[in-house]
């Protein structure tokens, strides 16, 4: 029963929770985990103030350990906090705050000079560590918009190989927050969003705002696209090196001598191999061959003409 206690300028609710030892294995709270969660909530709900106080232990001065979490810029400050130890690629933060298909969508994007992708996604303030449809929509909108801009401006004209979605997300830090009335959670730990309608909502929100940002900030856009090209080039070079090692492993594993000068063509039907007598002839043949499809292998000793030789000579 609620009774009137008198006039007050304060309002709110106290919620007390004590873990049941018969259900929970551990009943002692870890301050660091609670602090991380309170900080997240302050970033996700800009303007609110959260005070965390640990009254289990007293400090030397007789006070309790206390932290105050407050953010005026929300997700913008969140990505700055995540990237605090990284060098930014561009100074501006790409910020999106809109509503698509009755779904509020808020996204903050920042590129840095590292090679890692750091994307955090939330639904109704719940950390969806397994991702879900909102993350799918974000990646789709980001990749399509950046690729379209790069092709339209001719920045990809000299690239001789394709780029993929991973290249666009190298050095990317982003926070995605959506509000869904009836969220459907999937996955083993129920931390993956399954609402299909969220894909198009986030996709549209990201592509619309990102397209506008790229047009208004051509210098930043060029830096981001150049970062993408660098990532694609590194990935392509790594794949080539890996294939070369695998190819050499196959050849050496098959018992072929190390003196074989292989060709670069992978299709056996398009390749030729020349067996030459001795290292001297092998060196001359290597200089005159087309290394794209012609391989040369020097043989030790004199080659026997089996058509004219006696049978016992052939098998000697």
Indicate where each model-derived feature is located.
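GHKL-family ATPase ATP-binding module
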Residues: 1-315
């Amino acid at each position: 029963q609620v009774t009137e206690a008198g006039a007050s300028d304060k309002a709110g609710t106290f919620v007390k929770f004590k873990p049941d030892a018969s259900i929970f294995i551990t009943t002692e709270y870890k301050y660091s985990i609670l602090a991380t969660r309170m900080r997240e909530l302050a970033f996700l709900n800009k303007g609110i103030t959260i005070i965390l106080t640990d009254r289990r232990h007293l400090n030397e001065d007789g006070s309790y350990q206390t932290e105050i979490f407050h953010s005026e810029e929300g997700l913008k400050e969140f990505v700055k906090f995540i990237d605090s130890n990284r060098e930014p690629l561009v100074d501006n933060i790409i910020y999106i705050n809109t509503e698509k298909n009755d779904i509020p969508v808020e996204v903050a994007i920042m590129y840095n000079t590292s090679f890692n992708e750091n994307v955090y996604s939330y639904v109704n303030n719940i950390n969806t560590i397994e991702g879900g449809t909102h993350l799918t929509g974000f990646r789709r909108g980001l990749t399509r918009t950046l690729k379209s801009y790069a092709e339209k401006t001719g920045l990809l004209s000299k690239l001789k190989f394709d780029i993929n979605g991973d290249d666009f997300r190298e050095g990317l830090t982003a926070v995605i927050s959506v509000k869904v009335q009836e969220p459907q959670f999937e996955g083993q730990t129920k931390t993956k969003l399954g609402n299909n309608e969220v894909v198009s909502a986030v996709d549209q929100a990201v592509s619309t705002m990102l397209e506008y940002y790229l047009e208004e900030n051509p210098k930043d856009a060029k830096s981001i696209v150049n970062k993408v090209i660098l990532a694609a080039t590194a990935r392509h070079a790594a794949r080539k090196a890996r294939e070369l090692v695998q190819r050499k492993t196959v050849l050496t594993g098959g018992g072929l001598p190390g003196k074989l000068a292989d060709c670069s063509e992978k299709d056996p039907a398009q390749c030729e191999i020349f067996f030459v007598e001795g290292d001297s002839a092998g060196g001359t043949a290597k200089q005159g061959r087309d290394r794209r499809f012609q391989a040369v292998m020097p043989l030790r000793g004199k080659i026997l003409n089996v058509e004219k030789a006696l049978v016992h000579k052939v098998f000697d």
